[in-house]
Swiss-Prot record:
L-citrulline binds at Y85, S90, N121, R125, S174, S183, E259, Y271. Coiled coil: none annotated. GO terms for molecular function: argininosuccinate synthase activity; ATP binding. L-aspartate binds at T117, N121, D122. NCBIfam families: argG, PRK00509.1. Pathway: Amino-acid biosynthesis; L-arginine biosynthesis; L-arginine from L-ornithine and carbamoyl phosphate: step 2/3. This is Argininosuccinate synthase. It is found in: Cytoplasm. Belongs to the argininosuccinate synthase family. Type 1 subfamily.
Amino acid sequence: MAKVVLAYSGGLDTSVAIPWLKENYGYEVIAMSADLGQGEELAPLREKAIKSGASKIYIEDVRREFVEDYIFPTLKAGAVYEGKYLLGTSMARPLIAKKLVEIARKEGAEAVAHGATGKGNDQVRFELAVKALAPDLKIIAPWREWDIRSREDAVDYASARGIPVPVTRERPYSLDRNLWHLSHEGADLEDPGNEPPSDVLLLITPPEKAPDKPAYVKIEFERGVPVKLDGEALDPVTLIERLNKIAGENGVGIADMVENRLVGMKSRGVYETPGGTVLFLAHRELELLTLDRATLHFKEIVASRYAELVYDGMWFVPLREALDAFVDVTQRTVTGTVVMKLYKGNCTPAGVKSPYSLYDQELSTFGRDEIYNQRDAEGFINLFGLPLKVRALMEKKAGLR
């Protein structure tokens, strides 16, 4: 019997995909789930996949690989999509696809499948990664083929086959969780005019209910990578887990946004990224201290393009690798310590130090002029403003003024 390897999350979409693939393709279905830091969600997957009709399931622990090879490069790049989204789902999809291909090769499968909808970004991310890594594999996307047209239809389909799913008609939210973030979409969130219900947040305390006393965290970076939290050297997974807890308790990391999907429509999502938000802002503060003006400003352009590549599923492309090479050069001096103050949803800097600081206090203060002669500014302004002056004079001469 021919085999298909399904990217399995245990959620609604992939739960109903198992019997559907068997009924419509006659495949032996092998499930593959990536442990990206979902935590307790993984516990019931093995039994659930088998009960749903899978012949076996692989649960791959890729947490450290996720952090070191996907999260940290994106963090160093300073990538954030449309000013708010820290790319938690986008970064995870190419890694899941990579593991999907590895299991397919191991099992001799002729196809892979995923549970992404035909309206979303994830279908693109999964399939571009598979095409880049294994162009010979057939890709099946049930949502683009079956008669199920809504999450409610999928719940009915699962119920008819005795498949337990975590989504009910009363709470039909689509969730995606990993070490970096938790996303919420669907139901009443689809109307951007609605405030998210108070029970939506699962990782972060609502800011108004957060402690009345601020919390401080000290993060040490080496070449753009966080290595210590409050003076303690930690492995990357533990560092993010601890920071998630501290930031979440203080209401930090909520992003409620309407974003432009790759497939051409806008969508509304609520993202919880507690630790990631702190790391992103802390890293930015350290760059402001250690990078020169030209490098910093050009890196902002790179960050925007990097975010688009990751969001669009273009992880395994030469351009992303080339941008990584540029970013790595910029991070040579991004070493130091940043203290961040967390208070009722706010995350602000409370001190930054680096042995590579480009800030010269004596030069920057309004004191004596031994180092910086203020009279020199006049000549600089005359030369810097010369194009403006010449243009104005020529326009006046031509009667345009």
